[in-house]
Amino acid sequence: TDAGVPAAIVAKKIKFNFGISSNYFLEIAKFRAARLLWANIVASYNPECLRDCDNKGANGECRCAAKMAVHAETSTFNLTLFDAHVNLLRTQTEAMSAALGGVDSMTVTPFDKTYETPDEFSERLARNQQLLLKEESHFDKVIDPAAGSYYIENLTISIAQQAWNLFLSVEEAGGFYVALKAGTVQAAVNESNKARHKAVAQRREVLLGTNQFPNFNEKAGDKQSVEAKCCCGGKDHTCEKDVDTLVFDRAASEFEALRLETEASGKRPKAFMLTIGNLAMR
């Protein structure tokens, strides 16, 4: 490396943190594609084994250095305040896809994090969700169970190609730091966030218990949405921003704001359904 540190040592010291979304097969393929790309990047540095090792390549390169260390965390984007126990289904699906994708460790977000500081009960459930995958489903006994699946293999290759092209375009523009300072990375992520919020609002993306099969009899009571308010992630403070920041609003935030406002007012809004055209054809 430029600092004179052997590439094998540097590669082994790097650990990646990923978020896990609710798209089951896509998430499995995402982690597989990430490992593939990282192995190719490390191989380009031709890392040398610094000790006697059986895991060497044809040219003597250290294959251990190409192993990607990944920690994953379930998403908060799709967590909801209302019908909060459905969050357990979301995080369990996400944890399962991450385990099948080959992550080394993971954090399962407690189901009540959206409206309170997680208590002992919700944290215990979050731990048990991982234990179920390990002790009941034996996910720790298999390596890359998705290998050979036509759908997942093709999805892996597709993600890897798209990610590599994006990586090259960022490098050609001056690198990630330049892109971060210019705000192009944040703009792309925020645009994706905006598109997903629109899809949820139009019910093109289903959020169970929010825009599909909501429980209208449920009352929020003392629940209040807990959202990060400043660029450093705090709730009640502001800080100066050297770069543009990301938008972390959850998918259900607009729906929840309407329901909380309605509940606080004590009056349900009325909607007039205007029928147009031939009723027999509807």
Model-derived regions: residue spans:
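Glycine- and acidic
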Residues: 14-26, 74-78, 107-115, 141, ...
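Short glycine/threonine-rich loop-to-helix capping motif typified by GTGT followed
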Residues: 21-33, 74-88, 116-126, 151-166, ...
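Mobile "lid/hinge" segments at catalytic clefts and subdomain interfaces of large enzymes
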Residues: 1-3, 89-167
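Intrinsic disorder at enzyme termini
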Residues: 104, 136, 140, 162-272
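Conserved helix-loop functional segments at active or binding sites
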Residues: 2-6, 40-51, 94, 98, ...
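Gly/Pro-rich turn-and-neighbor structural signature
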Residues: 1-78, 82-86, 168
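Generic beta-strand/beta-sheet core signal
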Residues: 17-21, 71-75, 91, 108-111, ...
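Short, intrinsically disordered, charge-balanced linker/junction segments flanking boundaries
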Residues: 50-53, 223, 267-269, 274-282
